[in-house]
Each structure stands twice: as structure tokens, then as C-alpha cells.
């Protein structure tokens, strides 16, 4: 009633007039008499006769249909409130008719025609104060008589009533939870009107200037209006033909999905509004409030509710309700609560949301990753590498590979001005990177990769191409961008698992097909339900969501074509960088003297597009013998003693004899590995204390060079040493830019590409000018390759 009064739109003056009128005793007496006249049946009969006479003057024949009680159907409308359908009867309606016919399967039967009349829905209040809607559906008495004798015919009458109300008043009725009540009629009976045009009569048009003439509230039926109604009826019949058999068959009881709402609830905390970086209010709510509308339910005793993680399921047999909801956040099901509101027939479920601390999850993930990394390192050291006594390594598969030092040599250059050849003896203490045989590599990849792709369906790989893609990640998601143009969206097929993602597609106006299989480590799990693919003109974007137990930065992935060996790809992270640096220079295989002279490598920045490192020169102390210790004094400069000698042989010569005498302030680091005859020498940078410049020059003049001991050679060597010392003492700010550095990099006299090998039997020296080595990892940046 309150809503109807609001629709009146009364002004304040009109309300005052009504208030004063009802305060007058005479007005109240007249109002009571008017109400009694309306309720009098005789007065209502006269009222109907007068209305019929006025309608006949307009060319319309009307009949008042007074419904006779039959039985009542209970259901719900729009999933919100109860709905009652009064199945009534009246003699003014046509009798039911039937015709023999066959159904779609060719079975013989009867086609029934059931005329009916509908009345508009009206709201009423129940005993508990809840609102419900009432509709009247009127048939001929013979229709209800047959329905009382035949149960199948009654089901036809019920389904006809439900479809008529739903289509005529554009409402949604719950057909799965229809129940027949024991009462015969619900509410107060209200008559309805049948209006038909009179044949052979001309309607009288009132004078528009007459103050007593009122516009006709109903449309006069015409031929055009009749055609439109026929068209609408045909459209409705065609729509009914597309309805599935399960929806038309009343015997099949399908559970109804109730209406529900999910609300996010949070609490205001003043600590979240401090002037601090960690005081940002969290976007994750504290609680989730799920409200489920169950209008046909009297209590929550027959409801089964189950909550696990992000899934919420609700089931009820009588009435038949079934609801499966995927919540936006993981909730604590043990601390939730549910309440049933009988007045509104609603089930209110409140569950707290698990508040994930991203930093804690990332730290736990990194600790687990380090533990697994140490375990894999211990296993790989036993399974993959076994060294023999003669300096060779035998892999787990039985293949034997010779040791090759990890050395990068520069091309040999001649000093034309001085006629001298600069050479650098290589240090045998340089670390060795053990090779992995091809068989062993395949075995490990089969164990790691193929084990992850057992559930992925195999596809023909002869015509498939792996696309070029880039990947990025954050603690909760991973994004892949496949750089393929003009992808046909209709050709995309995907397969998602807990540890893999597979996509195949083809290109428009081309026969080429692309196939990409991405697999992850067993502890890196993705959520198969939260995957999206966005296709554009230039590429395809694939978004993967990490599971809550795998939140953090992942270490690596494997990619390739399905059915073929996959390639390993590591993410750019601090752990991966440290692991690469640790693997490239294992300290356990380097002598203590060499460890002191190892360069200090500092990675400033490393991304997929750019790598920035800093290599610091170590500060070492001069180690000399006892007979020359007195010559080492304080020295203000950091010098690098480079051995320069005059050679009488060309670059292509294979042997060269030299003296074994060395400088007092020079240290030759030698490593005899596995009792072999190979020896590599490299002069190290030294820092002498307590020695003046003049003393240093005097000592350098006493050096003995192989092949020539003249003063000319001594002075040339001294000049070369001083020049090298000055170049090494340049400050970092005085160094030239990268372009100048790369141009003059190969022209430095202190570097040489000569590699010497001393024979074990005759002591001959073999000069190797062309030398290739093996690198533990590939540099994407050319500067890193040059520095190596």
C-alpha cells in the first residue's frame, strides 16, 4: 500500500484537505456508506449492468468473469518472492476441444485446445508480513473436471497456466518447484472482463468539447491490430519449438538455481591511513557476504551447504535448489557462519577471507627453491660428473670427454714500432667448466620435461612451428606474448593443466601452423580456471594465474613444440644470476693463489633487454722470495708487470726457448692438474711496498730476458711496463666511452692471443695462435662476451 500511495503524487495541500475531511464526522459517515454500497452484491450487479451498457454504446461487448475456486499452485516469481496461481473455472469460457493427431515420433494421440482467461497479478500480505503475488487463471468447468479425473491432463493444465502467466506478464516462474496446495483459492476473488467488438454496430464518438467526455482507456481492436497479434502468436509458437524437451516435460525435475549476491565487506582501520609506505589499505576484503534468495524455503534444515577454498555449493531436495558459486577469494570455511531470514526467505552466509601476505609467501617460496636447488646440485654432482685420474671426465652415460680450459683469447698483434711481440702466459689455475655429454643432457631433459608433459595430447610436429614469445611474471601471475601476426581466432585450441599450458593456432591466408607448449616445475602450479587469451593483429597475449600455494617468482620454464624435446628458459632473477656466476667460477677448483686474483664481478642491472655489470680489479700483495724481499718497499702506484721479450721466431713457429728466471716482484701461478705436463703461466698484477721508483727501475734493468740481454731490450721492456702501469691506473671516470673502448680493445699491447704448451718429454714449447674454448653460458650482450 505504501508504494501505491507514493505513486499518487499528492501535494501537501491535498494531504491537508484529506486530513481535515477525515476529521469531520459527517465525511466519515458518508465514506462508510460508500464502502457498504460497493460491497453490496446487488449494487455490484447494477454497476456491471451500467458498465456493459456504456461499453455497448462504444461498440464493445463485455462480460464479467467471476472465478469459481478450483485449486492453487505455489511457486516463485523471478526467484525473489512467492507466487500463487488460482486455477479457477467459469461457464463463459469455451469448452476444451481435442483432435486426433501424431507427435514428432509418429505416435498417435490427441491435440487439446484449452481456452483460458488471465487476470493481472496483485500483491497481498501473508501472515508473517511477507509479500506475495497472486494470479487467476480461469478455464471452463469441464477442463477442471477432466483434470480432477486424469493426472496427466492435470499436468497439461498446470504447464499451460505457468506458460501463460510467464509469457503474458513477462515474469520468470520456477517450474521445477511447483507444488499443489490443499486450499481452493488464495486471497479475495476479483472478477475479470472479456471485451469483444460488436459486429454490425458503429461506435459512437463523444464530443471532444464535452466536459463530461473521458478518453477511452482501451484500444479499439482493428484489422491491423489483429494481424499484429497473429504475428506475435506465430513468433511465440516458433520460440516454443526451440525449447528443449526437458523444459517442456513436467516429469523431469531440474533443480532451480536461486538468485544470489556476493558483497565485499571490509573494516576501516586508521593504521591503514598513516603516512607510511606500508599503510596502504588492502584491496582484499575482510569478509564475503553471500545472500541467497530461497522464497519457497521455510527453514534451513533441508539445505546442504559446503564451502572449500573458492568454491561454494548449496543443495536442497524439497524444494529443489542447487547453486555452485566460485568466490573471488580463498575463504576460511571453518570460521564462517550462515543465518536464515524467515521474513525475507534469504540465507545469509558470512565467511572471512584469508589475508595473504605476499612478502611472506615470496620468502617461503625462495627458501623452498633454495632447498630444492641444493638437493639437485648434490644429486647432479654424483650422477653427472666423474673425473678420471688422467685429467679426463667420464659422464654417467659412459662417454669420456677431455678437459678444456674456459679461456677466451684475443688475436695476436705485432708491435711494429718497437719490433717486439707481446705475449701473456695463461694461468693454469683458471676454472674448468665440466662438459655434459649429449646423451646425458637428453636423459636429464626427458626426466624433467617429458615427465611434466605426460598428460598433454601428442600432436604431429612435422608441420608445426614454435612461435617466438616473450614472458614476464609477478608474484601472482605470468604473462606470455606470442609474436605472431594475423592469427585466426577460430583455429585456436588450448589445453591447460596444473603444470603446463598448450596452445595451437594458424595464420589467416596461410598454411603455417604454430604450436607452443609451456611446462613448469612440479612445485610451480597454475590455476586452470583463471586463464585468458587476448588476440590482436600483431600478437597473442596469454595470461596465467599462479595458484595460492605457488605465489612468488618462479625460476624457469620449458617450451617448445608438443611431442618434441623442450628448451629451458630461465627468468631474470637474483637467484638465477648468482647461480650462473657461481657455476662459471667454482672456487673449489681454483688454487688459493688464484682466488686472490679473481676479478670481483658485480651485476648492477640485468633484464631481458639489457645487462649492466661492473668488474673490479682485486688488490693483491706482492709475494716474493726471501732473497728479494728487501727490495720491495712502499710504492704509491698499482703496477702490472708484463713480461715482454724479443723473439726471433715468427707467429707461426711452434717452439720457443726461454729462460726460467723471473722478476722479483712477479708471481707466476702454476697448477699441475692430475700430474700432467701441461703448464699455463700468466703474470698477475702485483703491488710492492717499500720500493721507490728509482729502485724499481734499477731492479727492472737487472731482469734477464731470454734470447737477448742487451740494454736495448731492457729499456724497451721497461717502457712497455711503465706504459701498461699508466693505463691500468686510469680512474673510472677517465675511461673512454664504450665505442672507443671497443675500437681499441684488440690493440692493447698487454693482451696476446698466444697460448703456449710445454712438452712433457723434450720440454719443447708449442705456440697455439688459434684457440677456441667453451663458455658455460651464452651472453646476450656483446659487451659481456668481450669482457669474458
UniProtKB/Swiss-Prot annotation:
Residues 417-427, 685-701, 744-754 have a biased composition (Polar residues). It is found in: Cytoplasm; Dynein axonemal particle. Keywords: Cytoplasm. GO terms for cellular component: cytoplasm; dynein axonemal particle; extracellular region. GO terms for biological process: axonemal dynein complex assembly; cilium-dependent cell motility; epithelial cilium movement involved in extracellular fluid movement. The keyword Iron does not apply. It comes from the Eukaryota. Transmembrane segments: none annotated. Residues 194-249, 415-438, 628-754 are annotated as: Disordered. Residues 225-241, 628-644, 667-682 have a biased composition (Basic and acidic residues). Belongs to the PIH1 family. Kintoun subfamily. Required for cytoplasmic pre-assembly of axonemal dyneins, thereby playing a central role in motility in cilia and flagella. Involved in pre-assembly of dynein arm complexes in the cytoplasm before intraflagellar transport loads them for the ciliary compartment. This is Protein kintoun.
Amino acid at each position: 500500500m505504501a508504494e501505491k500511495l507514493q505513486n499518487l503524487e499528492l501535494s501537501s495541500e491535498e494531504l491537508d484537505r484529506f486530513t481535515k475531511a477525515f476529521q469531520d464526522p459527517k465525511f466519515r459517515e458518508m465514506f462508510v456508506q460508500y464502502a457498504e454500497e460497493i460491497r453490496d452484491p446487488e449494487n455490484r450487479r447494477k454497476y456491471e449492468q451500467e458498465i456493459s451498457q456504456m461499453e455497448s454504446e462504444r461498440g464493445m461487448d463485455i462480460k464479467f468473469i467471476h472465478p469459481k475456486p478450483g485449486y492453487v499452485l505455489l511457486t516463485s516469481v523471478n526467484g525473489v518472492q512467492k507466487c500463487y496461481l488460482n486455477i479457477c473455472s467459469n461457464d463463459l469460457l469455451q469448452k476444451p476441444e481435442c483432435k486426433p493427431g501424431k507427435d514428432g515420433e509418429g505416435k498417435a494421440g490427441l491435440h487439446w485446445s484449452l481456452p483460458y482467461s488471465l487476470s493481472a497479478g496483485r500483491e497481498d500480505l501473508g501472515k508473517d508480513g511477507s509479500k506475495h503475488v497472486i494470479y487467476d487463471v480461469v478455464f471452463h468447468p469441464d477442463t477442471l473436471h477432466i483434470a480432477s479425473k486424469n493426472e496427466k491432463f492435470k499436468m497439461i493444465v498446470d504447464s499451460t497456466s505457468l506458460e501463460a502467466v510467464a509469457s503474458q506478464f513477462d515474469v520468470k516462474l520456477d517450474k521445477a518447484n511447483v507444488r499443489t496446495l490443499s486450499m481452493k483459492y488464495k486471497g479475495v476473488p476479483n472478477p475479470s472482463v472479456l471485451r469483444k467488438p460488436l459486429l454490425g454496430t458503429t461506435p459512437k464518438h463523444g464530443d471532444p468539447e464535452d466536459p463530461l467526455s473521458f478518453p477511452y482507456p482501451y484500444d479499439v481492436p482493428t484489422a491491423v491490430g489483429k494481424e499484429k497479434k497473429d504475428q506475435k502468436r506465430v513468433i511465440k509458437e516458433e520460440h516454443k519449438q526451440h525449447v528443449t524437451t526437458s523444459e517442456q516435460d513436467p516429469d523431469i525435475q531440474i533443480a532451480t538455481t536461486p538468485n544470489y549476491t556476493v558483497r565485499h565487506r571490509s573494516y576501516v582501520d586508521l593504521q591503514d591511513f598513516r603516512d607510511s609506505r606500508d599503510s596502504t589499505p588492502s584491496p582484499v576484503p575482510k569478509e564475503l557476504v553471500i545472500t541467497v534468495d530461497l522464497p519457497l524455503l521455510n527453514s534451513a534444515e533441508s539445505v546442504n551447504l559446503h564451502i572449500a577454498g573458492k568454491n561454494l555449493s548449496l543443495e536442497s531436495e524439497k524444494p529443489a535448489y542447487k547453486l555452485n558459486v566460485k568466490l573471488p577469494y580463498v575463504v576460511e570455511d571453518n570460521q564462517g557462519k550462515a543465518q536464515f531470514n524467515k521474513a525475507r526467505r534469504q540465507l545469509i552466509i558470512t565467511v572471512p577471507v584469508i589475508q595473504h601476505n605476499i612478502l611472506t609467501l615470496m620468502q617461503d617460496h625462495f627458501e623452498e627453491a633454495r632447498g630444492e636447488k641444493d638437493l639437485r646440485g648434490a644429486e647432479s654432482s654424483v650422477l653427472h660428473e666423474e673425473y678420471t685420474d688422467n685429467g679426463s671426465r667420464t659422464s654417467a652415460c659412459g662417454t669420456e670427454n677431455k678437459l678444456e680450459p674456459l679461456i677466451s683469447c684475443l688475436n695476436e698483434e705485432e708491435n711494429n714500432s718497437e719490433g717486439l711481440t707481446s705475449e701473456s702466459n695463461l694461468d693454469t689455475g683458471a676454472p674448468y667448466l665440466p662438459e655434459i655429454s649429449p646423451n646425458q643432457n637428453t636423459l636429464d631433459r626427458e626426466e624433467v620435461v617429458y615427465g611434466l608433459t605426460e598428460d598433454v595430447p601428442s600432436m604431429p610436429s612435422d608441420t608445426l612451428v614454435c612461435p617466438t614469445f616473450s614472458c614476464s611474471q609477478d608474484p601472482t601471475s605470468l604473462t606470455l606474448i606470442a609474436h605472431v601476426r594475423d592469427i585466426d581466432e577460430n583455429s585456436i585450441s588450448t589445453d591447460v593443466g596444473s603444470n603446463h599450458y598448450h596452445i595451437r593456432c594458424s595464420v589467416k591466408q596461410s598454411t603455417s601452423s604454430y604450436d607452443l607448449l609451456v611446462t613448469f616445475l612440479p612445485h610451480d602450479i597454475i590455476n586452470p580456471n583463471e586463464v585468458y587469451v587476448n588476440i590482436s593483429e600483431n600478437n597473442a597475449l596469454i595470461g596465467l594465474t599462479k595458484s595460492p600455494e605457488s605465489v612468488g617468482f618462479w625460476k624457469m620454464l620449458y617450451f617448445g613444440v608438443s611431442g618434441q624435446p623442450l628448451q629451458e628458459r630461465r627468468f631474470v632473477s637474483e637467484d638465477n644470476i648468482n647461480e650462473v656466476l657461481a657455476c662459471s667460477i667454482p672456487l673449489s677448483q681454483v688454487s688459493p693463489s688464484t682466488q686472490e686474483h679473481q676479478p670481483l664481478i658485480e651485476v648492477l642491472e640485468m633484464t631481458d633487454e639489457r645487462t649492466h655489470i661492473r668488474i673490479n680489479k682485486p688488490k693483491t700483495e706482492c709475494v716474493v722470495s726471501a732473497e728479494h724481499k728487501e727490495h720491495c718497499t712502499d710504492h704509491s702506484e698499482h703496477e702490472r708487470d708484463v713480461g715482454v721479450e724479443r723473439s726471433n721466431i715468427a707467429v707461426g713457429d711452434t717452439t720457443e726457448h726461454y729462460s726460467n728466471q723471473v722478476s722479483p716482484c712477479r708471481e707466476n701461478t702454476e697448477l699441475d692438474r692430475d700430474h700432467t705436463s701441461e703448464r699455463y703461466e700468466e703474470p698477475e698484477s702485483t703491488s710492492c711496498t717499500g720500493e721507490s721508483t728509482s729502485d724499481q727501475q734499477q731492479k727492472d734493468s737487472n731482469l734477464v730476458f731470454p734470447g737477448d740481454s742487451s740494454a736495448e731490450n731492457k729499456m724497451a721492456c721497461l717502457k712497455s711496463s711503465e706504459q701498461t702501469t699508466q693505463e691500468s691506473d686510469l680512474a673510472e671516470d677517465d675511461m673512454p666511452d664504450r665505442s672507443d673502448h671497443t675500437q681499441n680493445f684488440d690493440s692493447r699491447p698487454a693482451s696476446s692471443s698466444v697460448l703456449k704448451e710445454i712438452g712433457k718429454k723434450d720440454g719443447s714449447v708449442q705456440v697455439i695462435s688459434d684457440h677456441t674454448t667453451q663458455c658455460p653460458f651464452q651472453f646476450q650482450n656483446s659487451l659481456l662476451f668481450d669482457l669474458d
